[in-house]
């Protein structure tokens, strides 16, 4: 029962984390930047936001964005993390206690769960490296006022995927635990009904 609960917890945690990684990859609010000193930017109300895909500046009510081409490693890591999440989540779906694929043994589910756990940990490592590397590189080029919501979503998503992957790998039981979730039903023998016969 404990192993079953841990399998479900690992799946839910990993799924939420993967969504966070996708949100981080697709949005541009990684860091809030300033082209001048911070007091000057606040006075002029000219703050920018920088992400994987564009560098945007809001000045005098106008929003200007220019595409970025110089952060390809971070972009590649986040795309890899997002792509790795799909097979990992699909594999985890097939090992949930409520899903059974034919007459497969518990060891088959166990192997799929282990593979999903490894993919989730790789996903988390890619996201962690990218979300730490990006603000360090951005700080060298411009003044960073604060971190954006995308970066926080990336950190939280990466940690959740790391926790989910570790739970699946280490705590969700062995091959026997995956086999215990199978239930077999046999057709019961029906007792014959004896109706009273009326003799006239």
From Swiss-Prot:
Annotated membrane-spanning segments are: 2-22, 76-96, 116-136, 151-171
Membrane topology designation: Multi-pass membrane protein
- Gene Ontology cellular-component annotations: bicellular tight junction; plasma membrane
What PROSITE patterns does its record include?
A: CLAUDIN (PS01346)
Protein keywords:
Cell junction, Cell membrane, Membrane, Phosphoprotein, Tight junction, Transmembrane, Transmembrane helix
The record's subcellular locations are: Cell junction, Tight junction; Cell membrane
Concerning InterPro entries, the annotation shows: Claudin, Claudin11, Claudin_CS, PMP22/EMP/MP20/Claudin
Q: Which family does it belong to?
A: Belongs to the claudin family.
User: What is the name of this protein?
Assistant: Claudin-11
């Amino acid at each position: 029962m404990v192993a079953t609960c841990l399998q479900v917890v690992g799946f839910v945690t990993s799924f939420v984390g993967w969504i966070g990684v996708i949100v981080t990859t697709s949005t541009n609010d990684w860091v809030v930047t300033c082209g001048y000193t911070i007091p000057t930017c606040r006075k002029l109300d000219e703050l920018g936001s920088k992400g994987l895909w564009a560098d945007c500046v809001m000045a005098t009510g106008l929003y200007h964005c220019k595409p970025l081409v110089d952060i390809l490693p971070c972009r590649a890591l986040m795309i890899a993390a997002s792509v790795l999440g799909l097979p990992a989540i699909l594999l985890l779906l097939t090992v949930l206690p409520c899903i059974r694929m034919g007459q497969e043994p518990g060891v088959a589910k166990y192997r799929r769960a282990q593979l999903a756990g490894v993919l989730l940990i790789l996903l988390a490592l890619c996201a962690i490296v990218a979300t730490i590397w990006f603000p360090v590189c951005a700080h060298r080029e411009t003044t960073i006022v604060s971190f954006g919501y995308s970066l926080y979503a990336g950190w939280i998503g990466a940690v959740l995927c790391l926790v989910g992957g570790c739970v699946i790998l280490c705590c969700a039981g062995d091959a026997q635990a995956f086999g215990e979730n199978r239930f077999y039903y046999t057709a019961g023998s029906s007792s014959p009904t004896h109706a009273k016969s009326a003799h006239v």
